[in-house]
Amino acid sequence: MADGRASSAQSGENLLFLTDEQLRQGIEAMFFAYRGFTADPDRILSDMAYGRAHHRAVHFINRAPGTTVNNLLNILGVTKQSLNRVLRTLIEDGLVESKVGKADKRERHLFLTEEGHALEQKLSDAQRVRMRMAYREAGPDAVAGFRRVLEAMMDREMRNAYGRLKDSGT
């Protein structure tokens, strides 16, 4: 029994205080995990001369069809100029459609086209495969703990935006 508790403590379970070395290892693990998480979509996007900004835009337009450019700016945390460059290419390539708002003609609402949905599906399928494998290997308790850690790392505004997106059920 004592051995089980020692190995649990070493793995980070039930620790209230982490050493700088344990924190550094967590930071490095996130860097490498992020590289793995983005590697598959990066390969798909590179064939189209797109980058991660295109991926994020397509992802969040898919999650909230009809979202406004301003809402997407808030979610992505990028400059208007940067987002406009990305949206221009996605619209020109027939992946995103921009419609003028009915209530406010100054607003532009964004929707994925059929081709945009196909790209989003391909990108998210690649990431779901990786996430599913990792979650299965880690187990349900680790999955719940991982999600809590990620949510705890978000600033309040980000956590609120994430909560709204999560609660939208799309």
Predicted regions and their residues:
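N-terminal leader segment of winged-helix/HTH proteins
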Residues: 1-48
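Flexible interhelical turns and helix-capping residues at alpha-helix boundaries
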Residues: 34, 65, 76, 80, ...
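N-terminal helix-turn-helix DNA-binding core of bacterial DNA-binding proteins
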Residues: 39-82, 93
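Exposed, interaction-prone assembly regions rather than primary DNA-binding/catalytic cores
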Residues: 144-170
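Hydrophobic/aromatic-rich alpha-helical bundle segments in the mid-to-C-terminal region
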Residues: 18-20, 131-141, 161-169
